[in-house]
Design a protein with these regions (language model features):
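Short alpha-helical elements
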Residues: 1-154
Length: 155
């Protein structure tokens, strides 16, 4: 399949992913590159799984691999590797020595969902805690109920 959408991987990008994740090279009905393209399309556009364009493999297959790779932290490995390469090119250590922590309260959920009230913001919902390095590259993310303060988040 040729490149159809702007989110589709180039051959060089795909070779890097294959090498980094040590993906098995065996005959498959659907190319893993097309499955990755489907995941990237979904992440970029925010569409629902069932609305994945027909140019990609069936949504169930793309979802299966997304869950599998998420469980085995393959995306974390890939992002960590890319972050290290860019940091080295900028003359920095491969791994960050410190991070910047911030949080944001968000309205979310219904009466049955685990949420609480952030006393400072007067928001009932959840709180996103994010750690980035000095370049703004993501290091860690954690979601808690809104009343957890940044010092207790243990991100």
């Amino acid at each position: 399949m040729s490149k159809i959408y702007p989110t589709d991987l180039t051959d060089n990008q795909w070779q890097y992913i294959e090498k980094t994740l040590l993906l098995e090279k065996r005959k498959r009905k659907h190319d893993l590159k097309e499955i990755f393209n489907g995941i990237f399309y979904l992440v970029k556009t925010g569409c629902q799984w069932r609305m994945l364009p027909k140019e990609y493999p069936k949504w169930e297959l793309v979802y299966y691999y997304f869950r599998k790779w998420s469980f085995y932290e393959e995306f974390d490995l890939l992002l960590s590797s890319l972050r290290g390469i860019i940091r080295l090119k900028r003359g920095q250590n491969k791994e960050p020595s410190m991070g910047i922590l911030d949080s944001q309260s968000t309205k979310w959920g219904n009466n049955k969902a685990p949420n609480n009230i952030d006393g400072n913001k007067k928001v009932k919902g959840i709180k996103r805690h994010v750690v980035v390095d000095k370049n703004g590259f993501l290091i860690a993310v954690m979601i808690t109920v809104a009343n957890i303060q940044i010092g207790r988040a243990h991100v």
